[in-house]
Structures are given as C-alpha cells and as structure tokens.
Amino acid sequence: MKILVVQGAGMNMRGKVQTEIFGTMTLDEYNQHILKYAAELEIDVEIFHSNIEGEVINRLYEANDQGFDGALVNPAGYSRGYPALTAAISQVKFPVIEVHISNPVRRGPVSDTATVSLGMVTGFGVLGYYLALRGLRDTRKGR
C-alpha cells in the first residue's frame, strides 16, 4: 500500500511559532514519526510539503496517475478559501483523510477540504496521523 502524506502551507513553521496551539514538535519530527509508524504498519509513505497551492495540487494529481492507494492531507493554511485544492481532492481516485494537529474547529469554521475528504482526524497531534494511517489502511483492506 502506497500513501501520500501532504503537509500544507505553514507546516514548516510547526515547533517555531504558535507553540501554544500546535506544540513544539517540528515538521521534520512529525515526518520522522509518520515514517516510523508507517513502516510498522508495512505502508509505503511518501511525504510532500509545499507552501504553494499549485504544487500540492500537482502532487495529488501525480499520485493519482501513479496509482497511490490514498492520501493523508494536513491542509494547514490551505484549510479555507482554496477551491482549486478542494476540487483536486474531490477528483483523485483514492480516498483522502484530512489530518490536523490541533482542533481547527475551536478557532473557526470547518475546513473546505474536509467536505470532500473520506474522514477527518483533529486535535491529537502526531497520533492523528497514526489514526489516519490505520483508518486508511483498514478502509482499503475492507475491515
């Protein structure tokens, strides 16, 4: 099973700013935890980060063409007001689970991208990625 993990706009600032909301873990630390847990689940994971919406959209379409089995997307700064990203998520053949380190609903309306995602995991920090990986794996295996 091959899963794309997309880390959206501003994720490179995790652990550096707004630590009262997002904690002190950096993007690199999150990615290392994700890779380690995915290996335990025998899931092949590719992690992609960009602060440029078009690059994220292109990577999702490429993953679609490359036969990926699913994606975890932390839209971060792309959560609201990015209709092209929302459209891209709705157009790929594989399921997408949206992940947020914190609970964004506590700070405002739900994300636009969540409306086209299979599911959403919020507020559990790095554990949210673990839950989403397991959920995606089990959903794809029909469990």
Protein language model features and the residues they cover:
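Extreme N-terminal starter segment of soluble prokaryotic enzymes
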Residues: 1-4
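Short hydrophobic segments within beta-strands
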Residues: 6-9
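Glycine- and acidic-residue-enriched helix-capping/strand-helix junction motifs
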Residues: 14-29
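Short beta->alpha junction loops
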Residues: 46-54
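Short acidic active-site motifs
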Residues: 55-59, 81
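Short, well-structured alpha-helical segments in soluble
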Residues: 58-67
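Mid-chain, well-packed structural core segment of small domains
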Residues: 67-104
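Short, glycine-/small-residue-rich phosphate/pyrophosphate-handling segment
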Residues: 105-143
